[in-house]
Design a protein with these regions (language model features):
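N-terminal signal-anchor transmembrane helix
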Residues: 66-70, 92-110, 120-154, 159-177
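Soluble catalytic domains of enzymes that build or remodel membrane lipids, polysaccharides, and related
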Residues: 140-368
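Non-catalytic terminal accessory segments
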Residues: 1-127
């Protein structure tokens, strides 16, 4: 089994290297044609270094800039593998009507222009959040309360690229909503809380206010950082309660259920968590990954809030997430059960969003 795993890793590295060679070769053909470069050694070193930056940072942890370089390179890879084959085909046909060098120069220039547009538009979408509003009616009676306004933000991935300025946008938009309660269904930080602490983001995040409090759950990236205790400690300092397979009542008006992430195999099921719940009261649940909508509905959850999918983050990845999840983004109602999946406030990897948008969700819940 161990040898099979090594074989898989080796195969992936070989395929990845071939793809990086293809991207690098296209870049060299254009640059050498435009500028007349003949020596490719330095160019090959730079492309190779950038291509493996995300792997190198796992070894050279004292060079955190490599993670940023590697993150941005992921976007370059995706769109290069979409655009460069088209550019190569264009050059092949154009060379029959104009000089090949001219075809290379102009096709490369157009490709770079498309790249610039993709990155400019993607960065704008990533750093310019919108507020999505949903109306949900739960036909249960709550003494002294007819409605509940929820501010929900998932997948902030606070760290290097989703930093202080983006956090301030979150605080501004959330407080502007004047919510009754703030819910954060996972991936609050980007893996390890070190950057969050280093940038002193906690006091800024603490400025988010709601009468009923701020609650969250763990996402897969909190586990990836292997520093869950440190993360929980930071959240506790800023009065954000992280629910770990817990069910609590909010002012005896409704239940709030918070699940551990699917990453933790021993987490409790919805059925177990709901076993002691008085289902005459509304039940709102947070589960980072939206894999178990049916289980939540069968257990008696009224409203499930999730994130994780990013709606693919960079088109056409949304085609994949649409097939992976029953609901990869938006709202669905099935009988008395409601589910909302957010595309997230932040981003993983490159600070780009195409086919999705950085968002905060405002849920207006009404009761009988």
């Amino acid at each position: 089994m161990k040898n099979f795993r090594y074989l898989n890793i080796f195969t992936i590295l070989i395929v990845y290297t071939i793809l990086m060679f293809y991207i690098g070769w296209n870049g060299w053909v254009w640059l050498s044609t435009v500028f007349g470069w003949e020596s490719w050694g330095y160019y090959a070193f730079i492309v190779g270094f950038i291509s493996y930056a995300y792997i190198l940072v796992q070894v050279f942890k004292f060079l955190p800039f490599l993670r940023t370089v590697g993150s941005i390179w992921f976007a370059v890879i995706q769109y290069a593998l979409m655009l460069l084959p088209l550019a190569d085909i264009a050059v092949f046909f154009l060379q029959f009507s104009i000089e090949k060098d001219t075809a290379i120069i102009w096709t490369g220039a157009v490709t770079l222009l498309v790249f610039f547009f993709i990155f400019a538009y993607g960065v704008f979408n990533a750093y310019s959040p919108v507020v999505r509003k949903y109306d949900v009616h739960i036909p249960k009676k709550v003494e002294g309360r007819k409605s509940l306004r929820i501010a929900m933000a998932s997948d902030m991935h606070f760290g290097k690229l989703s930093g202080v300025a983006h956090l301030k946008r979150l605080v501004h938009h959330v407080n502007e909503m004047e919510p009754d309660i703030i819910l954060l269904p996972g991936d609050i930080i980007d893996d390890h809380p070190g950057v969050f602490i280093q940038k002193n983001m906690g006091p800024i995040m603490k400025q988010m206010k709601a009468p009923l409090g701020v609650y969250g759950v763990l996402g897969n990236h909190e586990y990836y950082g292997r520093a869950v205790p440190e993360f929980l400690q930071e959240m506790d300092k800023i009065d954000i309660r992280i629910l770990l397979d817990e069910v609590i009542t909010i002012e005896d008006d409704f239940y709030l259920v918070g699940r551990r992430d699917k990453t933790e195999r021993d987490r409790q099921s919805f059925e177990n968590l709901m076993s002691t719940v008085d289902k005459s009261l509304p039940v709102i649940a947070m589960d980072h990954q939206p894999f178990e909508l049916k289980q939540a509905a069968d257990a008696g959850v009224d409203l499930l809030l999730s994130g994780h999918t990013h709606r693919g983050q960079m088109a056409p990845n949304h085609i994949v997430t649409r097939r992976m999840y029953e609901l990869d983004w938006g709202y669905v109602q099935k009988g008395a059960f409601h589910a909302i999946v957010s595309s997230g406030f932040g981003f993983w990897g490159p600070p780009l969003r195409l086919g999705s948008r950085s968002e905060i969700v405002q849920v207006e819940v009404t009761f009988e």
